[in-house]
Structures are given as structure tokens and as C-alpha cells.
Amino acid sequence: MIIIYYTNQYYFSVIISVYNSGRYLNESIGSLINQTIGFENIQIILVNDGSTDNSENICLKYKELYNNIIYVKIPHYGVSKARNIGMTYAKGLYINFLDSDDKWESNAFKYVALFFKLYKNIDIISCRIKYFESWNHYHFLDYKFKQTRLVNLTQEYNCIQLSASSSFFRSSSIKGKYFTEGVFSGEDIRFIFNILLIKPLLIFIKEAIYYYRKRSDSTSAIQNTEINKNFYIWTIQYVQQYLIDKSISLYKKIVPFIQFYIAYETLFRIESKAYKFLDSNNYIKYCNAIESLLNQIEEKFFLEQLIFPIILKLFALSIKNKSDINKQLILRNESIIYSNYILLNLNKYKYLIIWRIVDISNNILHLEGEDKSFLSREKYFYFCKISNQKYYPKYNYYSVYDFMTMFGNINEGRVISFDIPLKKNNNNQVNFFISYNNKIIEIFPSFGKFSHMSSLSHSYYTKENFILKKINNKLAIYPYQHNLENSFENLYCIELKKINKEKIIDLRTQHFEYKRNNLNKNYKIWMITDRPDQAQDNGEYFFRYLNKLKPKGIIFYFAIKNDSFDYHRLRNLNNIIDLNSEDYLKFLLKSDKLITSCSELFIKNPIGEDGKYISDFYNFDYIYLNNGIIKDDLTKYLNKITQKFSTIITSSKKEYNSILNNLYGYKENNLLLTGLPRYDNLFRLKKLIQTEKFILIFPTWRMNIKGTRDLVNHNSIKSEHFKNSIYFQFYNNLINNKELLQIMNKYEYKGIFCLHPNFIAQKRYFIDNNIIQIKEICNNQKILLKTSLLITDYSSVFFDFGFIEKPILYIHFDYDEYRRNHFPEGYFNYKKDGFGPVCYDSKCLIKNVEYQLKNKCKLKKIYSKRIKQFFRYIDDKNSMRVFKGIIKYKNYIFKKTYYFSSKIFLILFLVVCIKIYFIF
């Protein structure tokens, strides 16, 4: 422990603005108490900025425990005011502004103290930012920390410092300086640059780590800037333009480090999705404000940005110059040049093509990936060579690769693919080339998701009778040999050991042993799932079908988290696996098929980023049972490059065609038109369960409401700003609408408002009553069957309700916003194809509810007709068709079947017999 003697009472003063951060506050304060420099050298000033959670209790607890902790309570003014008030209590030589949900590495203050003593003329020290919780990366600008050093911004103008929380300030240098109050975003930047414009010197300490919490519920201030409309126009005026004007007033010019920062900020803003949130008037104002920044900054400061794609930088310059910069690019010595600035070297740049899918089938090498080039497409084309034979690619267009910006789409997504025949007993080598302006250059492709190869140099992939391996800018393909595979595996494990991946090595060793011992296995393994924490969907019903069928040669498992309700409900069945266990991963790697109704990444890759090191073992067919009928345009989320489904289950010819003919990238052999397995049970129970006087209100979720699901634990997360959303306000008002409740009471109806799984943690905000209750889980089919009337917005649950031919009301109070922020409209038009009336406000909805209750919730003929036209099958043979389709039974998919009762069948049989009698 270091004991320091100085005239100030403390060496450090740490000011923490606290606002509703009770969940994290213990961790933040604990990181200060545990500093190796000694907590007696640190003063903490806790400023409670009007918190409404348990933050005050935590603050008071620490104040009672430690004399060097001060607690101040103020109304909710905002972080700037809270910090300014905190500074009036500071008695330390050096000041830090720790955010109340972040924390410090335990030795950080020790390093900072050392460098402040060494450099007595320095006023700012910057520490390295590392994200934690839902991210595990260093900050975008981490290149500044290549080494611990003193930086003069007049020379290294790209080393901009944007965070006050990860900085330490000499208290004497900030006397009389304050954070600008009322600023929602950018208060740190304005505060820091006001100091640096006077003295552009600071120290970067690589070893001192500031941990920035990237919240799973997306409720931090930085994460929510897109939601607060002040960020768009207000901060351009009061932060970016302010700094430009301040620099000009001091130096008669915009100094380079301010220009570099403005270019950095402008590119972020061009790339933002503000067009989703702003009305047309504010959108135009915002674009004009961005253009104003562009016009004040020199070109080179955009080109020198390291973290942005080249295509974005060139697009920004095209806006600035009002001309297409791409047409001004030239090729010189294999380099692409603009205005004497080298953008990239074509034969060294690794991201012209990223192969997303690499596969071998029937001695054909299939490569499919993303064309990442920013070049004018009329000027170049790709080809590859194998054994001096040239092959040219096919091009497809997937919307997932569109690059949408504030000023429109700057890159039409393009997928490139090769199909190359391989010679069985020969060593093959594939070389890749680009022809640009008639000059041929060998290029260096990269390998991404579903390529079965990681970024490590000794990564390889075994498939059929071949072994694939990257060698520099080539793809080498060898005939399979046991010894060669062993050699490659040893080299790969040595490389994994160097990066401390011992667990991955153990996993690979176990799996190799399994493969060697089961070369001639006479059975298949099928892994089946629904959501990680919830069953009762197509996965469970298909699993139950297999349990009854007991197909020979197939071992099937159902996986779900062991802390879920459904895990304990299903425990009496055989082969139930905990989705969170190591067993799940081991069985998944052994599986021939992964059959799931859930498209979450965790299902197919339960170990996150480390999954890339075992991606060569992911050889199962990936079968998507669907968690509902696809009606919207989901090309961005379910396309082949993003998901790589082997098979997708569909229920309607319209749904089938929308996937086949749209930009999903799938072919007929990837699609089955069978119906959903859960419909079997729904069809059977329809005859057994009687409808009751019951209304089900069942809306879907919204992508633009942050805090939907925890990316780590896959659970719903509480979100403070959920209660301010239009979504919450509409539905909370609806379920408590006096007119609606009076109508329901008059006709003796009860109701349930069902929360989407992504919003379960938000239940606390809703207010129920004695007529409409709020429930978390409503996917029990018995609830649907007991229900007389369904009210929904865009949830595909209405297809289930239509399947059993019951009335539906749609409420589209936020239709434009939903289409803008959630999913674009697909083939299904609610007015033309819907199974019920569409309302756009609560008045229309309540009127239709009254009509339905008055008429005993009878389905109108027009909607009954639409339902029958929509579904390919209305029977209980869906699981059977899925099973047959999976095991490659043919000639049944498009034969429309009708379900006859035994009585109807008997009548038809008698009619046929009578006709035959009279004929003869």
C-alpha cells in the first residue's frame, strides 16, 4: 500500500453522479475501495441525481461505513449539474468522474498517481476503456493505447479523448471550469476539449483499465442517444459547432485534432439510424446540420479515420463535394488511390470478399460470401483459378448487405458464389483474383461465419474426402488422410494454446475421440429445441411426435434451460438436456440435425465468440421449424448468409413463395410446405375444449424499445425507458379503458393481456384490474382454445387463432413506426389478407369489440374464406409431414389434403358403392 503526503486532504476525488443505478452501484464503489493505492487516499462524492430506485439506500450505507465518502442529494437535474455540484466538495489533487454503472481496474489509480508525479505539467491522464457485460471489447479508439506515453495533440491529432469518466484531471486545471448543463450528450467532449484547446498535452496509460458497462438492457446514456431527439440537432450546435467556433476564435483556424474529432463524429452521424426516429422536418434539419459540419472539415481528416469502412468515408466526401468520389479513384501499383491518399492495397486487403459459407458436397466446392468492395462495379469483376482453370462467380442480391445511412443506401448488398469441381485424389489449390480496370491482381479473401474456419492461421476443415486449409491468400484442398488431419489438428491446438484456449483444446480432443470411435455408427442424433427458456412450441410438439413414433436409427434429444418452468414440466420424458450445460454442446457437436423453432444464435453456438474455434465441428443440418408463420419481410434476419438453414418449415403457399422468390437466398430444396407441428395438437384439442367468454390481448414486441432481452442470460431485462414508450402507454391505457371494461362487464367477458417473452420483465409497469389480468406466459394452447376473441397487432399468433377459425381484431396504432423500426411489410397485407378487421385507434377497436361480443364472437364468412385459402393444410398431420420431409420423403409436399371426419368418409364411401351398384 502506498501512503502519500500532500497538502490536499486526499490524493483523488472521485465524483459519481447517481441516477437509478442501484443494480450496479455496489460494484462501482467497490472498485474504488479495492484500489491498490489504498482507499484512504481516495475521496468519493456520491451525488444522487433524483434517483427513484434503491440508490439512496446504497449511498447512505457507504457514507456510514467510510468517513471519506460524501453523500449529496439533489433533484433530477442531469449528469452535468450533478458533477458540477460534486466538484464543490472535491478535496483531492486529481479529479475523476466515474459513471455509477462502471468500474475501475484495481491497480488503475496506482498507475495514474505514478504518472502525475512524473509529469507535473500535465493536466489530463487518459485510461484505456474496455466494455463489459453484453460486450467484451476495447473502445473503438483503442489504437491510442499502443503504448503508455505522453501525447502532443498538435502532432498526434488522431489521439482524441472523448470520455471524462476514463480521464483524470489535475484539480487546479479545472478550477472555474464546469460541465455544460442541459446537454443530453457531448458534455464530456465539450469539457475536455476546452482544456485541450489551451494545453493540447495528455498522457495515455495502457495498463490502467476503465470498465465501461455496455448494458444488456440498453439503458445507458450513450446507448440511448438515438432515442433522444435532442442528440441529433442540439448537440451539433452546442458541441461540434461550438468547438469549431472556439478553435477559430483562439487560433484563427480549426486545429487538426478538432477537425479529426468533427470528422469522427460526422461519420458516426451519417451512419446513424436517425431517419427511423425523426419526422420529415427534423430529418431535413439534421441532414443539413451534418452537411454543414462536412463542409468545414478538410478531406484528409475523413480519410484518416481508422474505424470506419472506406465506403462510408468516400460516401461522406461525395456528399461534401457533391460528386461521386468513386469515379475519381485510380489504380497505381496495385493500390487504390484518391487525391494522392492510398485507400488500400488490393493484394493485401483482406475484406474485398468474406466467404460466409464454405462447403463440399459430391466433390463440388461451394463458396458463398459477401462482396465488400466499395469500387464501381462496372470497373471490376472476380474470378478464381484451380489447376489453371478459371471459374467465374454468380451474383445474388441480399438486402442484409445494404448499407443504410442518413443519406440513403450507399451499397446494394451483393452475394458472390462459386461452385468448383474438385479432383478426388489430387491436391487442389484455389487462387482468387480481381480484374480492376483490366489489370488482374491476386487478392486475399477472408473467412467468416459458416465457413467452418477461424481467423487463426492453422485453422482447417474436414468434409467428405477432403481437408481444406487456408495458406496465405490461397485455399488449399487435400485428399483426406488420417495422418494429415492429425498433423493439422496438432498445429491448430498449438496455436490455440498460445491464446489460452485450453478448454477449446479439451473439447476438440474429446470430439475427435468420439469421431474416431464412431466412424461406422448406424444411428443418427437429432437435437430439438424451442426458445432457450420456454418450450410449448413447434420443437416440443415435434419431439413428442417422435416419442410416439420411435423411429429406428434416430436418437433424439430436447434441450431447454434447467431453471425454466418447462424443463421441470418435461423432466418425465426421456432425453431432456439442460441447454446451459456442457452436455448440450457435446451432444450438439455429435448431432446430425439441429431442429429448432428458435433462430437465436445461442441455440446453434452456445459458447459465444469461442464458437469460431470449433466451427469445423458444426456439421449438422440446421432445420428451422419456425416459431410462427413468416408474413413480414425478414430477409435481413433469416437469409441464407445470416442463418444458413438447411430447411425451413412453411405452412402456406404464399409464405413458401415469399421465401423462394425473395432475397432470402434459399432454393426449393431448402423449403418444406408441411404446416407447423404445434397445429396437430391445436386441431385435436379444438374438439375437446369449449370456448369461454374470454378475450385475449396478445401484442408482439418492438425492436426499437431497448432492453428486450439479456444477450448473456437470454432473459427479459427491466428497462426504465420502456414505460415512456408509445407502446406501453397505448396498451396500459387500453386494458384500463373504462368503455372497454364496461362493454366486457355488460356481456360478462373476462380478459388476459399477454406479455411477449421479450417484455416479461416490464410487467411491473402495467396496471391490471378485476376484468383484464396481465400474464407472462400465454403460449399454452388451452388459452387460445378457451378464448372467444383475439386482439393483436402484428403477432403471428393470429395464424394459430385463424387455424381454429375464431374471430380476430388487429390494432395498428403505430403502423408506420412499426414498419420503420421493426419489420418491413412482406407478402401479407392485413386489409386484403387479414383474418379480421384492422383498426388504427382504440375507438375503432372498442367499437369492433362491442360488435363481436354482441354477436357472440362469430367469425364472418369473408374471414373464414381467407383462412381456408391461406393454409395449405388444416389437419393434424403436420408433424408427420415434417418428419417425412426431413428424412427426404418425396412427392407429398404440394398435394393439398383435406381432413375428413369418419362420418363424412363413411357417407362418401356409401355414395361410391351405390354408384358402382347401379353401373353394374
Where are these regions (language model features)?
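N-terminal pre-catalytic "stem/leader" segment of glycosyltransferase-like enzymes
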Residues: 362-591, 881, 900-918
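A donor-sugar binding/catalytic signature common to diverse glycosyltransferases
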Residues: 601, 606, 621-624, 777-822
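A nucleotide-sugar donor-handling region in carbohydrate enzymes
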Residues: 505-513, 620, 626, 632-724, ...
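Catalytic binding pocket for nucleotide-activated donors in carbohydrate/polymer assembly enzymes
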Residues: 668, 764-769, 796-871
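Conserved catalytic-core segment of nucleotide-activated headgroup transferases in glycan assembly
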Residues: 252-253, 259, 533-547, 677-765, ...
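Active-site and donor-binding regions of nucleotide-sugar-utilizing enzymes
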Residues: 367, 404-406, 523-682
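Nucleotide-sugar donor-binding/catalytic module of glycosyltransferases
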Residues: 1-238, 695, 800, 882
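C-terminal amphipathic helix plus adjacent low-complexity
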Residues: 510-522, 836-920
